[in-house]
């Protein structure tokens, strides 16, 4: 007797197969399973931000005007953080704070938590989209892994930092000038520029920009068979199918310039991936430290000597005084509910004064 072993064919596809077929179909804009997370969250995050910057005031949370309706422009409009008194409330529209009143919800800062949480999940959805597409076309997932850097920075700055502080109030508001104010806040209250994790982040981002410029220029410089014109801009053909730059020539050039050069394309491109992503991750780790109020470098001996000797001052001690000034002025402005009043004689003065 012969037994035929084979796969049982289903007469009708189940719901999962139907959805999988539709979601992963080849179309102009790929949807995918990741799109179920990405597209709704990105839509709500961007929609909330445009709504907030256009219509919603920050008078009730920060005592500020923050919308186009109140006279702000693109650089000064923002979706502001909730009031300090609301601590870490999720500020759900149907929660005990707003009780389903949309106007009250906006006044309390509910749009900020709405944008922050949907924005975080949208970024995660975008990373999953890169994983999904890479798997579909049989690529390695380095794009998705690289995108973990921006996600780490967003989550650490907008979510973990305020969770470590007293409330969402101390997170950055979503706006250009608001982010600048937050940077000054980080400097004044945490001496962020002297933090080694910030230094690694700066080195990563600026180093990546340098590597990108060097790499692009080198490839352009070593192109061949791209046309018969003497001028690169006239001869270069962006639709050229095959790779026609000379790695050997590039290696020879940089060997003469620096004494060392990349001889392997994979190592070169991995290094270009590694530098910025590591920098972003280091910055994110540093911000998590600040959430716990960890200090960076404190050169106390210089501070003591500067306090005792009117003629001794370093760039560090001058910066410390600047930080004290930022704290003294910013705390009173940012937290009017605390009724902070600093007499003139306690405001910081440098030895030069």
From Swiss-Prot:
Residues annotated with Phosphothreonine modification: 2
Keyword Acetylation: yes
Binding site for pheophytin a: 130, 143
CC cofactor note: The D1/D2 heterodimer binds P680, chlorophylls that are the primary electron donor of PSII, and subsequent electron acceptors. It shares a non-heme iron and each subunit binds pheophytin, quinone, additional chlorophylls, carotenoids and lipids. There is also a Cl(-1) ion associated with D1 and D2, which is required for oxygen evolution. The PSII complex binds additional chlorophylls, carotenoids and specific lipids.
GO BP, sorted A to Z: photosynthetic electron transport in photosystem II
Keyword Thylakoid on entry: yes
The protein's Enzyme Commission number: 1.10.3.9
Any Gene Ontology CC annotation: chloroplast thylakoid membrane
Chain positions recorded as Fe cation binding sites: 215, 269
Disulfide pairings: none
Assembly: PSII is composed of 1 copy each of membrane proteins PsbA, PsbB, PsbC, PsbD, PsbE, PsbF, PsbH, PsbI, PsbJ, PsbK, PsbL, PsbM, PsbT, PsbX, PsbY, PsbZ, Psb30/Ycf12, at least 3 peripheral proteins of the oxygen-evolving complex and a large number of cofactors. It forms dimeric complexes.
Name used for this protein in its record: Photosystem II D2 protein
